[in-house]
Amino acid sequence: MSFPKILLGGTMKYLIADLVTELKPKYSYLQTLAKPFEYFGDREPEISISLSDEYLNSMLKKMVSGTTIGAAEEFSYAGKFCQKIIKYNAMLIHSSAILYNGRAYLFAADSGVGKSTHTAIWRKAFGNDVKMINDDKPVVRIFDGNAVAYGTPFDGGSGIANNISAPLGAVVFIERGESNSIRKAETPEIIKRLYFSTAHFVSRATADKMLTNFEKLITCTDFYILTCNMDISAAYTARNEIVKN
């Protein structure tokens, strides 16, 4: 039986979503993901998170059988981070995020629908013009009416967690269908879908602020509903509507 590598050392600074963040990862899984985000500048930490062994072990017991303690640590730090960023006009959107034509596009879907499959189709269709930002937990922040998407070191087990940021082009909610079509999303369905994407990070203390963040994001971002199959034509259907020249 192999065990995750336990790290020696103390708290490290990282720059995640342009927030100086102190983390103390104990296992190599999160340390490897977080390394590209290491920060050596003079800014003071805005977020500080340290999790005890007792907390990590309690989280591990709640997770799917076979989950490693390293993966449980990554999941736990992700949850705490996403709670703390809410006051900074930021939110996690559970999605697969790509960089295309200088902008970030986030594709969100219920588990099993195929958000990662869809962004893989984009890579097949458009090759090196597409770069992956994060395949599970990108963050969006709003600055003076403009939204920016950020990669994070939290990968949800996908292995894709790059330190890339870009202006947000659109958020697309995916539904599976036999043929491909896309339409603009209405405000009530946007709020409902955003809520399900972020609900497990929201507490009573942060609920009002998160709703304010939703309102700000809806004001400055295009949202779409994409009904699609797994054919390469689905990427063209989405691209032709959401990418603005």
Predicted features along the sequence, with ranges:
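Conserved lysine of the Walker
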Residues: 115
